[in-house]
A protein has these predicted regions:
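Transmembrane beta-strand segments of Gram-negative outer membrane beta-barrel proteins
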Residues: 27-42, 60-78
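A short glycine/small-residue-enriched secondary-structure motif
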Residues: 68-83, 87, 119, 128-136, ...
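Outer-membrane beta-barrel pore proteins
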Residues: 43-46, 50-65, 102-108
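Gram-negative bacterial Sec-dependent N-terminal signal peptides
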Residues: 1-21
Length: 482
């Protein structure tokens, strides 16, 4: 097989949109409609080429010699944030993601390739919402607050039927990630992050912060009486990729053991990713300040103040964003000729990768950036997510030779601590309830569909912003077997 270069893989990858919402934290609750319809269970039974995102060893259970799956999914989050008696709804309410996978048996071996959305999260609040003007300042900014994090994979699986009812599988994954962010911060947030004696929600440092601190009168400086807001902006209008991008690799291992006819045990391990930093050379930052007119003109303080914007251009780097390791164990039992039940338990190790969200802004060394030209700022938002345990339960009933019905539940806790909950990253959905069906048009052509509903949950951050989140999602897949 020809070796695809890292650059070619990335070019292919960004031509596919990937999701930006939250299910099990940022992970999807089910990959492929067969799994999703059964509550996200997938460790111990054949669930199509989506096995490359679940337990690759189940590809070895595929009864046909070759299989092609083509799928489309939609995630429909319903997110609202409120504070002080006002509320705002997110306009990001539908995210579509295609997927494709192919697998083929070669004797005891199975190979293939798949391209799937991994997960993400995001919101989109209008500039006309209460979030669009953090200080309710004289400057009317109408700031859009938007986040869209998306992660996808191209997966190359290899499985082996070792005999004696044992099946083993592994994958090599090319992983890409993209992030759009438009985020307004109030003066109180900035002061908390910049003051070493405070830093309850995050911290900021660097030569740019030092230069601003020398002007910021609440910190003993001269020239800036107040900061109405600071605004980070690196976002594009593409449905296919984020403004800040990175890529790297991951991998999975799995096994299935057929205890007896119709009763399987399976397990998998998804390794933590090795992604490089997400970067864009086209980022912007602006600060709305009440500044001394003399200082603003490059001279001595005049004692007269005016509202003004300080726009900066530069490079933004999101440091060390990774996807977590996942451990999963499951069973599947064919209770009767037509009735199957399955159960999985999964641990998603968010604590290892979501301790902090760190951005580094390097201002361009150009005249338009004034005294901040060439300066650097590191901003860290504390996250401190907890590891998440997920229990998936599912059942399938073969109504006729052509039609199978599926039902399931996916049960978990919110991994995001209330103290650090952000309206832009409300990955707080917990339980999901699912249903689906499969229909065989012939021995070689079939369709599978699943729908998932996450009831509304509500959490309030330490800053007093309440986020509510419910979600409806579906997946549709057409398959050809031969």
């Amino acid at each position: 097989m020809p070796v695809l270069s890292r650059q070619l893989l990335f070019s292919i990858a960004i031509s596919f949109p990937v999701i930006a919402s939250a299910t099990n934290g940022m992970n999807m609750e089910g990959y492929g409609p067969i799994s999703l319809g059964m509550g996200g269970t997938s460790m111990a039974f054949d669930n199509g080429v989506a096995a490359v995102m679940n337990n690759p060893a189940t590809l070895s259970l595929m009864p046909e010699k070759k299989r092609l799956d083509v799928a489309l999914g939609m995630l429909g989050p319903d997110v609202e944030s409120s504070a002080g008696g006002v509320s705002a709804g997110s306009d990001g309410d539908a995210y579509y993601m295609p997927a494709v996978g192919w697998a083929k048996h070669y004797g005891e071996w199975t190979v293939g390739m798949g391209m799937f959305a991994q997960g993400g999260m995001g919101t989109d609040f209008s500039g006309n919402s209460f979030m669009g003007n953090p200080a309710q300042s004289a400057i009317s900014p109408v700031l859009e607050n938007r986040s869209e994090l998306s992660v996808g994979r191209i997966v190359l699986p290899l499985t082996y039927n070792a005999g004696n009812n044992w099946h083993f599988g592994a994958t090599i994954d090319f992983v890409w990630a993209g992030l759009d962010l438009k985020m307004a911060m109030s003066e109180n947030q900035f002061a908390d992050m910049a003051n070493p004696a405070s830093q309850q929600a995050g911290r900021t440092s660097g030569s740019l912060v030092d230069s601003f601190g020398a002007m910021y009168e609440p910190f003993g400086g001269t020239g800036v009486r107040s900061l109405d807001y600071a605004y980070f902006d690196y976002s594009n209008s593409s449905d296919y990729s984020g403004k800040a991008r990175g890529n790297g690799f991951g991998g999975k291992l799995g096994f299935v053991y057929e205890v007896e006819k119709g009763f399987n045990i399976g397990a998998s391990y998804h390794a933590k990713t090795w992604l490089n930093d997400l970067e864009t050379d086209d980022a912007n930052m602006q600060m709305a300040v009440n500044i001394d007119t003399g200082v603003a003109g490059g001279g001595a303080p005049s004692g007269s103040y005016v509202d003004s914007l300080i726009p900066l251009s530069g490079k933004m780097t999101v440091k060390d964003f990774q996807w977590p390791a996942v451990l999963a164990l499951g069973v599947s039992k064919q209770v009767s000729e037509r009735w199957q039940v399955a159960a999985d338990i999964k641990r998603i190790q968010w604590a290892d990768v979501m301790k902090n969200f760190t951005m580094v802004f390097n201002a361009d060394n150009v005249a338009s950036n004034g005294g901040f030209a060439g300066k650097e700022m590191t901003a860290t938002l504390f996250q401190n997510w907890e590891d998440q345990d997920v229990i998936a339960l599912g059942t399938a009933y073969q109504v006729t030779d052509e039609l199978v019905l599926r039902f399931g539940a996916n049960l978990s806790d919110n991994p995001v601590p209330d103290q650090y909950l952000s309206a832009l990253f409300p990955a707080v959905t917990e339980d999901h309830y699912t249903a689906g069906f499969g229909y065989d048009f012939s021995q070689s052509d079939m369709v599978n569909f699943a729908i998932s509903r996450a009831p509304e949950v509500s959490f309030t951050s330490a800053s007093g912003i309440t986020s509510t989140h419910s979600q409806t999602s579906w997946q549709l897949m057409f398959s050809r077997l031969w």
